[in-house]
Amino acid sequence: VQLSPLGTTGLQVSQVALGTAPLGGGLFGDCDEQQAERVVHEALDLGITLVDTSPYYGDAEERLGRALRGGRRDRVVLATKAGRYGSDDFDVSAARIRSSLQRSLDLLRTDHVDVFQLHDVEFVPLEQIREVAVPALLALREEGLVRAVGVTGYPVETICALVEEFDLDVVLTYAHATLLDDSLMTRVLPVAEANGTAVMNAAAVSLGLLTPSGGSMAADHPASPVIREAAAAVVALCQREGVDVAQLANQYSIQRSGAATTVIGTRKPANVRAAVEAAGEPIDEELLAEVLALRPPADQRTWPAGGWRG
């Protein structure tokens, strides 16, 4: 897997990162510890060097900590988060951020994390993020307790505003470098690059819309009918051409986003292998052009997330 610098942090990260939300069980579906360990070990064996987790992801941190025993911790850039602890459980106070870091260190069986981010900032009033949470992160970095700090979230406007206001090392945003939307490339990257901030990309398949079964989840997906209709057209085109739409979506997002890394979350070792293959396989440019011609109705459109109404 190709490595690239994570902005100015001095960290080198793989083009594909492993997302551990599906490994924690609970809200994110069934996954036992043995299955989680197989996925982590497969990722490391394939050359993935960045693993992304969070207290919000059920048992993911604890399972990841056990999976990284035996010297494996030294092989990864470990990223975790604070601020979100459940579907409706948010706390961005300085004390909770600090105690959350300590709990994560204990569960992950490590004495440091490389990347520490606020999780889903759009669910908390922005003044709390600006006045309390980000300063708490910066203090932890100043004390040497974490190497790099940043924020994660969906709304492009919020992410860009925080990048411009604070000395953030990295940001993560999702579903904005897809076959449906290139906001990461056109809006986030220019601001991030101007401020020396690295960008992590996620949700290449647009939270499931760009999969063969994407249509079946439409009722539960936050996207508007316009976005869902564009996704259905992309899925139908790929099916007619005999192409796995999810693999094309991963190819495009990994290879064309311009982000330092693209986080792929899965509970299946085969999907980890497919993501690594997507990073290196040549894209069918003719098919991609046809797919992107279906994008305009959905491009730059967003869905509600937290306090952000889209």
Language model region names:
Residues T8, G65-R73, L105-R109, L162-F166, ...:
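Acidic (Asp/Glu)-rich catalytic clusters
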Residues D30-A43, V92-L108, P155-A161:
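Short, acidic/polar
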Residues L105-V124:
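Active-site groove signature of glycoside hydrolases
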Residues V121-G310:
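Beta/alpha (TIM)-barrel catalytic core signal, keyed to glycine-rich beta->alpha loops juxtaposed to Asp/Glu
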Residues L6, L18, A36, V51, ...:
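Conserved, mostly hydrophobic/aromatic
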Residues V13-A17, T49-L50, Y56, R75-A79, ...:
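Structural preference for beta-strand elements that scaffold enzyme active sites
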Residues V1-V76:
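N-terminal binding-site loop/beta-alpha segment at the start of enzyme catalytic domains
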Residues P22-E33, A82-R96:
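Active-site mouth loops of central-metabolism enzymes
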